């Protein structure tokens, strides 16, 4: 019995199952926890199917989503795995980024091949920047004809290539989640083979501390005799005392300054790291030079923009969203990080209006610049009430 000990140092990766309804996403999720529990009992608890299927509801940016979270370990890595019971939950999760994915397992039933939701999930994965996909060709025990399996695999590869994933090169593994869950050894081994493919083909993402420094400004105040302090939670990177930073967004000009002090809980620090709530003392900056909604960054690492394309989910009436559709030139507020900026929405050609509960692509022109990169999340608000959520898919100006 192979023993793998729990190492806090194991690389951590966030993944999820995506694919058409009833192709076996939840069964596969349960089966993965079972075979890994059987192989490394010290490391893994098995999660039953009905535990995952009755996913608790979460609220993200005012949107209610059912998401099941399970965790497990292979010999190489520690995984957090998300599975959503309903198709609408998937769309909401992927667009709002409630649970970020470093990679996805695309589940396709060998008995059906790619179906409409398979396409929709692959398109969304491309739009919202899920960087890597591994394919689980599920229910392979129900197809006797090797040629049919090969045809389905080819179809899936073509679909992935169509959406700019490396369809010819990524792993496609034949599995039977149900048989593995029932304890069949042969199919259990094939599922371990799938996890080997996930270990190999989905790279460990860079840690937040390795990325360029960025902190959204939450508050600004003056300390007599010391200068201006801005507070916020460091989103990524590391900042050391006496480093130079840029303050960008909201205003037309960027400001460059030096950080002369970093404080946390009234203690002075040499450096601040991703995830920490800190106050930064800025040299030569007046209180009115900085405002909530701007970001403090490693110089040159991010730029402010006013126009972008986005994928958005619009809340239904039941979720507390709008009761009526909106049309071209809709002007809500877009809430980025810590502040609202008004923007004008242009709908895609051929889209007359967007109903509450829909997901849509849109182009947005903001009235003030916002520091942004592709993948940045936002809420759509009307007078402080959330009516939608989305993320930037392409910056145009």
Curated annotation (Swiss-Prot):
Subcellular location: Cytoplasm
UniProt source species: Kitasatospora aureofaciens
Protein EC: 3.6.5.3
Catalytic activity line of the entry: GTP + H2O = GDP + phosphate + H(+)
Name this polypeptide is given: Elongation factor Tu
Location of the region described as G1 in the Swiss-Prot/TrEMBL record: 19-26
The keyword Cytoplasm is assigned to this record: yes
Family: Belongs to the TRAFAC class translation factor GTPase superfamily. Classic translation factor GTPase family. EF-Tu/EF-1A subfamily.
Region (G2): 62-66
Function statement: GTP hydrolase that promotes the GTP-dependent binding of aminoacyl-tRNA to the A-site of ribosomes during protein biosynthesis.
Region: G5, residue numbers: 176-178
Positions of the UniProt region annotated as G4: 138-141
Region called G3, residue ranges: 83-86
GO cellular component terms, semicolon-separated: cytosol
Domain tr-type G: 10-206
Major localization class: cytoplasm
């Amino acid at each position: 019995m192979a023993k793998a000990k729990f190492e806090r140092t194991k690389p951590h990766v966030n993944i999820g199952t995506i694919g058409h309804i009833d192709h076996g996403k939840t069964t596969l999720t349960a089966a993965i926890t079972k075979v890994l529990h059987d192989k490394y009992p010290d490391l893994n608890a098995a999660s039953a199917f009905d535990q995952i299927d009755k996913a608790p509801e979460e609220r993200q940016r005012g949107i209610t989503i059912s998401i099941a979270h399970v965790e497990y370990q292979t010999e190489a890595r520690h995984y957090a795995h998300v599975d959503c019971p309903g198709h609408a939950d998937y769309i909401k999760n992927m667009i709002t980024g409630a649970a970020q994915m470093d990679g996805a397992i695309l589940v396709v039933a060998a008995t059906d091949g790619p179906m409409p939701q398979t396409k929709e999930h692959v398109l969304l994965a491309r739009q919202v920047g899920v960087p890597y996909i591994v394919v689980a060709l599920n229910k392979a025990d129900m197809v006797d004809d090797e040629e049919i399996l090969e045809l389905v695999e080819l179809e899936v590869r073509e679909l992935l290539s169509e959406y700019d994933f490396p369809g010819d090169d990524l792993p496609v593994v034949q599995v039977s989640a149900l048989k593995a869950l029932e304890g069949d050894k042969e199919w259990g081994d094939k599922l371990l083979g799938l996890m080997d493919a996930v270990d190999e083909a989905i790279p460990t993402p860079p840690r937040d501390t390795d990325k360029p420094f960025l902190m959204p400004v939450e508050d600004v105040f003056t300390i007599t005799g010391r200068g201006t302090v801005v507070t916020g939670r460091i989103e990524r990177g590391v900042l050391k005392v006496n480093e130079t930073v840029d303050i960008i967004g909201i205003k037309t000009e960027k400001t460059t300054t030096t950080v002369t002090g970093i404080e946390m809980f009234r203690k002075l620090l040499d450096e601040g790291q991703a995830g920490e709530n800190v106050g930064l003392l800025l040299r030569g900056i007046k209180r009115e030079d900085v405002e909530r909604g701007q970001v403090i960054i490693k110089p040159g690492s991010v730029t402010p923009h006013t126009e972008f394309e986005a994928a958005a989910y619009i809340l239904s009436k039941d979720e507390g969203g709008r009761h009526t559709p909106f049309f071209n030139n809709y002007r809500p507020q877009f809430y980025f990080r810590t502040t609202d900026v008004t923007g004008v929405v242009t709908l895609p050609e051929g889209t007359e209006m967007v109903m509450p509960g829909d997901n849509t692509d849109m182009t947005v022109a903001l009235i003030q610049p916002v520091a942004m990169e592709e993948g940045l999340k936002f809420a759509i608000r009307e007078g402080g009430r959330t009516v939608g959520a989305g993320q930037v898919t392409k910056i145009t100006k």
